[in-house]
Amino acid sequence: KTNKKPESWRKEIEHFNNWLNPEIGHLPIRKITAFNLEKIKKKMLDEGRAPRSIQYIFATFRQVWNYARLNDIVTHETPTRKVKLPKVNNKRLRYFTHVEVDILLEALKSKSQQVHDMTLFSLHTGARAGEVFSLTWGVVNLKNGTAQLRDGKGVDRHAYLTDATQSMLEQLHQEQDPSELVFTDSEGEKITKISNTFERTVKELGLNNGVTDSRDKAIFHTCRHTFASWHVQNGTDLYTVKELLGHSTIQLTERYSHLRPD
């Protein structure tokens, strides 16, 4: 039994028919070797297929192989282990301009005050979506203008509140218990994903018009990249940006180095 959606099945069948079947469909599965798979990889690269697509094809093949192995049709490990796949570059490049931020925040405010506030907080602190969702009043210090952010690995760092984020949080703050979340869903529970309002608004504003590379697409995480990019453009040194973002190594922060002013 599987929990796969029909769309996932459709894509896997399509990929199998387009790429795997022409090269290895005539072979008994036990006869398929790394050499056959190398030919598939080369053909995909020659036709300009992205590393992500190649990895998806090989993942589809692994599923078939693992099923065959589970049913004693084959006994050895999948030949994909001997094929070096191209690496996927998932480093996002996009950040918002000041004009884009202004129109985005204005549009969000008219649709959802909460999505506006979460977007503003991420733009001004560099917080990841998960850090925004986990923010409690106990780690927000309105007197000192700071907030303590905790990433998915349990590592804490301090964020410094701008006038805009300070004002926004002051409007939200009442006499909440320190353990209470700053942002909650309609039932008062922890938010688990950003509202579709963000994506719809980005689309309505045309912020992704003409964008074909997924790394250039404007998504909620673009707010974090915008925070970092603006800091570097304003002359903040990379080591300070590293600390503000909570990066584990300076190499992660160096993606912004080309934005430094001359």
Give short role names for the model-derived ranges:
Residues 37, 61, 97, 198, ...:
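Mobile genetic element proteins and their domesticated derivatives, centered on retroelements
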Residues 47, 51, 55-57, 70-129, ...:
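Basic, Lys/Arg- and aromatic-enriched nucleic-acid-binding interface segment
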Residues 15, 36-39, 100, 131, ...:
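Ca2+-coordinating acidic residues in Ca2+-binding motifs
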Residues 1-73, 90-92, 111-113, 155, ...:
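N-terminal core-binding DNA-recognition domain of tyrosine site-specific recombinases/integrases
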Residues 47, 102, 106-116, 125, ...:
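Short, basic (Lys/Arg/His-rich) helix/loop patches that form interaction surfaces
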Residues 95, 148-154, 164, 245-262:
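Catalytic-site neighborhood detector that most strongly recognizes the C-terminal catalytic loop/helix
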